């Protein structure tokens, strides 16, 4: 029967029609996802928080609730998608900043300072408000640390390479670079999360203080 024909036995016109139909459906799905993602970013940028509902996203995007749940299992999955996209962007930006330096410690410092800056409101036209997503990542890490760690993989691997390079160059005395990378990331994330609740700017932990603390803890004499 016709339905039992293998793909190679099907008429060319049928294969072309199926391919065209799949391509159209794929493009339509991509457009719907883009609408939902755009709407979520707009809400985050306007409100400075991820405290909005699926219905808010649906209303802003012009899509339906049915379409939303065809694309995402819920709000958390949508936020995780935004987080993963922002981390990929962040990894590229961190690499570009690091590549401006040549010395191992200077490269590691550039990474640390930039990682801290990413948690701050940029105030630049066209840029997104990333801090609410960073806060979401901290909260999600308490219930799903494996998924969050996987999302941060591009950023984590870059840091690990920088630490390995610094150790190989004799600039750091670290026996376990994976643990050192985890300590540095956690210190940065905890510090800017803590800073949210401190009204006096003088009492907030700065990126420079984090760097000084880490570099001495890792057994290095920072360049003067």
Q: At which residue positions do the language-model features occur?
A:
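Amphipathic alpha-helical segments used for helix-helix packing
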Residues: 119-143
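Amphipathic alpha-helical packing segments from all-alpha helical-bundle domains
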Residues: 88-91, 139-168, 178-182, 193, ...
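An amphipathic alpha-helix signature
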Residues: 37, 109, 113, 156, ...
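N-terminal intrinsically disordered/low-complexity leader segments
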Residues: 1-31, 222-224
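Helix-turn-helix
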Residues: 35, 43-77, 81, 85
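Amphipathic C-terminal alpha-helical segment
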Residues: 117-121, 161-165, 169, 181-201, ...
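Hydrophobic alpha-helical connector segments
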Residues: 81, 95-125, 181-184
